[in-house]
């Protein structure tokens, strides 16, 4: 519904009715269905907001920071950080759909030529590069701003992000995901608009001497 005058709800939210509340007030029904978990959204909320809350209800963690002193880990490259509508990271779609949206993310283990389709494609849409730490690795995916859900992205190119499998969502100060971007550091925001690698923008090397560089 639209924003009303109820003082208890100031923004979209997910929640669950507690057993204590139900025992005191009885079951809450809507259209003959008992309500347990719920999502409150306003009719003027953006499509991105609707998608973010729906995906969270399906198990996807929010990726935005709750404390402003830490850099945003993902930004516009995943709808769970926002603010615009875009595809979730391929790793997110693999992990939080139980392998039903994305079956697997193969690892690059040797020098070779690899085909990487854009992130909206069902196959060959990501690769991972392992590190010495079994809980950390890098993921490569190709983002195409000609895709209907990604038209707001600044450009097309290769996106590289780090995954910490022992973290969950926007855990502070080290999050589960971190998208590498120009001038980015663990404590420096950098420029998320300049995250992609391509021959067109001149970022075509990812090494200890490049900007950004692969810190873990």
What residues fall within each predicted segment?
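Extracytoplasmic Ser/Thr/Pro-rich, glycosylation-prone low-complexity segments
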Residues: 49-50, 75, 173-216
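Active/binding-pocket-proximal capping segment
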Residues: 155-168, 174-186
């Amino acid at each position: 519904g639209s924003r009303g005058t109820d003082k208890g709800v100031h923004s979209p939210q997910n929640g669950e009715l507690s057993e204590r509340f139900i025992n005191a007030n009885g079951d809450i029904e809507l259209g003959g269905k008992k309500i347990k978990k719920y999502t409150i959204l306003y009719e003027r909320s953006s499509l991105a907001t609707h998608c973010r809350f729906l995906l969270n209800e399906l198990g996807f963690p929010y990726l935005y920071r709750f404390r402003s002193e830490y850099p945003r880990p993902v930004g516009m490259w995943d709808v769970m950080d926002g603010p615009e509508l875009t595809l979730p990271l391929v790793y997110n779609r693999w992990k939080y759909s139980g392998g039903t949206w994305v079956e697997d993310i193969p690892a690059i283990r040797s020098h070779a030529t690899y085909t990487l389709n854009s992130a909206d494609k069902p196959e060959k849409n990501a690769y991972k590069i392992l590190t010495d730490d079994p809980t950390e690795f890098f993921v490569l995916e190709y983002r195409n701003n000609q895709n209907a859900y990604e038209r707001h992205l600044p450009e097309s190119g290769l996106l590289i992000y780090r995954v910490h499998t022992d973290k969950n969502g926007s855990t502070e100060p080290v999050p589960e995901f971190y998208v590498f971007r120009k001038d980015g550091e663990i404590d420096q925001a950098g420029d998320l608009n300049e995250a992609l690698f391509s021959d067109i923008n001149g970022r075509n090397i990812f090494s200890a001497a490049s900007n950004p560089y692969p810190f873990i």
